[in-house]
C-alpha cells in the first residue's frame, strides 16, 4: 500500500525544526529507507517534511526505524500523521496543487515535488505504483496551475515579506542565503525602488550572476559589519543552527525588521526583546493578509474538479493494473488458437494466396475478439464487477476442451 508520513499541520515551529531533513543527506536517507520500504520519495522543503512510501504494512517498529534514520527523537511521534491508500494519494494531489501550503496557493511546491520525484527516480527508489502516482500528481499540478491561472497572482513567503517591508518604507536590505528562496527574494526586491541590498553568501562567485549596482555581495562571515545599518533583514539559509544571534543586534539604532523564512529557524527568538527589532518567523508570515488570499482561494476552489479528475484516473490505472496478468494470459491463449487454426488450414491447403488470405482473416478475427474481451474486462473492472466478468471470459475463451 501507499502511505505518507508527515508533520501535523498545526505543529509549532519549535517542534517542526526538530523534524527536518538534511538536504545533503537525501541519497543516503533513500538508501537506508529502501531496506524497509518498497519505494520512497522524500519531500523536504523549508516548511514541509513528508515521506511517501510503499510498504506491505505499517507498525510502530517501522516508524521507529524511520525516526532513527532521520535522527528524530521518537518522543515527537505525536506530532506525526500517517495516511494510507486513498487518503495518502489525495494528500499528494492536494499538495501539488498548493492546498496544503503554509501560504495558500504558493507557486513553488510543484517544482519541489518534481525535484523530489526525480531524485528518487534517479536513485532507483521507486516501484511502479509510486512512480505512476507521482506522474499523475505532477501532471495534475501542472494542469491545475495553468487552468486556475494562479500565476496571475503569484505568491510566496518571499513575495509577502518583500511587499510588507516595502509598505513599511524599508530602503536598505540584507538577504542571508542564495538558495531557491534567496534567489526569489532578490528577484522581488530588485523589482522595487530600493536603495541597496547586501547579499550575504558563502560562495562569492555568486557575485558574477548579479549585475545590479544596488547589490553588494559579501562573505557570510561579514554580515555583522553591516546588519545594524539595515532597515530589513530577510534570512533564508539552510543552516541547521541559528545564524543571527541576539548579540548581533545593537540595542541602540533605528528600527529593524527581521524576517526568518527558514526551518530550522535562522534567527534567535530573543532578538524580540530588543526594543528596536521585530522578528517574524514563517508561521507569523503565513498569517499576513497579502490582499489576494481570498482571490486565490476562490480560484483554487472552483478548479478542484481537476484534482478529482486526475485522482480518479490514477485509481482507474491502479484497478486496471490488477487485471494485467489476465490480459497477458488472454493474449497468449489468443496466439495459441490462431497458430493452431492457421497450421490446420496450411495442412489442408497448398495454394499460397489462399493461405495468406486465411492467415490475415484468422488473425484479424482472433485480434478482434481478444481486444473486445479486454475492453469488456476493463469496463467491468471499473464498475467493480471484474470477478464475474473474469469467470465468464475464461469460460468462453480460455477453457480447454
From Swiss-Prot:
Catalytic activity entry:
(S)-4-amino-5-oxopentanoate + tRNA(Glu) + NADP(+) = L-glutamyl-tRNA(Glu) + NADPH + H(+)
From which source organism is this entry? Clostridium botulinum (strain Eklund 17B / Type B)
Protein name listed in UniProt: Glutamyl-tRNA reductase
Q: What domain of life?
A: Bacteria
Report the active site residues.
46
Residues crossing the lipid bilayer are none
Annotated positions binding NADP(+): 177-182
Q: Which HAMAP family match?
A: Glu_tRNA_reductase
Named in its record, the pathway it takes part in is: Porphyrin-containing compound metabolism; protoporphyrin-IX biosynthesis; 5-aminolevulinate from L-glutamyl-tRNA(Glu): step 1/2
Amino acid at each position: 500500500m501507499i502511505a505518507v508520513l508527515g508533520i501535523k499541520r498545526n505543529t509549532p515551529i519549535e517542534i517542526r525544526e526538530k523534524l527536518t531533513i538534511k538536504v545533503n543527506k537525501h541519497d543516503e536517507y533513500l538508501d537506508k529507507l529502501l531496506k524497509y520500504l518498497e519505494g520512497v520519495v522524500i519531500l523536504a522543503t523549508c516548511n514541509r517534511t513528508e515521506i511517501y512510501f510503499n510498504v506491505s504494512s505499517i507498525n510502530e517498529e517501522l516508524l521507529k526505524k524511520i525516526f532513527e534514520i532521520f535522527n528524530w527523537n521518537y518522543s515527537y511521534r505525536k506530532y506525526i500523521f500517517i495516511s494510507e491508500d486513498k487518503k495518502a494519494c489525495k494528500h499528494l494531489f492536494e499538495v501539488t496543487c498548493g492546498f496544503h501550503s503554509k501560504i495558500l496557493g504558493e507557486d513553488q511546491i510543484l517544482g519541489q515535488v518534481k525535484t523530489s520525484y526525480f531524485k528518487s527516480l534517479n536513485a532507483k527508489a521507486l516501484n511502479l505504483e509510486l512512480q505512476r502516482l507521482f506522474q499523475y500528481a505532477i501532471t495534475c499540478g501542472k494542469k491545475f496551475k495553468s487552468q486556475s491561472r494562479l500565476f496571475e497572482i503569484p505568491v510566496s513567503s518571499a513575495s509577502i515579506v518583500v511587499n510588507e517591508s516595502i509598505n513599511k518604507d524599508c530602503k536598505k536590505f540584507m538577504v542571508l542565503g542564495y538558495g531557491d528562496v534567496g534567489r526569489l527574494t532578490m528577484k522581488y526586491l530588485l523589482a522595487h525602488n530600493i536603495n541597496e541590498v547586501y547579499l550575504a553568501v558563502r560562495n562569492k562567485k555568486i557575485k558574477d550572476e548579479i549585475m545590479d549596482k544596488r547589490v553588494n555581495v559579501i562573505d557570510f562571515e561579514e554580515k555583522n559589519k553591516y546588519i545594524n545599518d539595515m532597515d530589513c533583514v530577510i534570512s533564508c539559509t539552510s543552516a541547521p543552527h541559528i545564524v543571527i544571534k541576539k548579540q548581533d543586534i545593537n540595542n541602540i539604532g533605528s528600527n529593524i525588521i527581521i524576517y526568518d523564512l527558514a526551518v530550522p529557524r535562522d534567527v534567535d527568538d530573543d532578538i524580540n526583546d530588543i526594543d528596536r527589532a521585530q522578528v517574524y518567523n514563517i508561521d507569523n508570515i503565513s498569517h499576513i493578509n497579502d490582499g489576494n488570499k481570498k482571490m486565490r482561494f476562490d480560484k483554487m476552489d472552483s478548479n478542484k474538479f481537476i484534482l478529482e479528475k486526475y485522482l480518479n484516473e490514477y485509481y482507474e490505472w491502479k484497478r486496471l493494473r490488477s487485471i494485467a496478468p489476465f490480459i497477458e494470459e488472454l493474449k497468449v491463449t489468443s496466439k495459441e488458437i490462431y497458430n493452431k487454426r492457421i497450421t490446420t488450414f496450411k495442412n489442408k491447403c497448398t495454394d499460397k494466396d489462399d493461405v495468406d488470405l486465411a492467415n490475415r482473416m484468422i488473425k484479424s478475427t482472433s485480434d478482434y475478439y481478444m481486444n473486445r474481451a479486454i475492453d469488456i474486462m476493463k469496463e467491468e473492472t471499473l464498475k467493480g464487477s471484474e470477478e464475474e466478468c473474469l469467470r465468464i471470459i475464461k469460460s468462453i475463451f480460455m477453457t480447454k476442451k
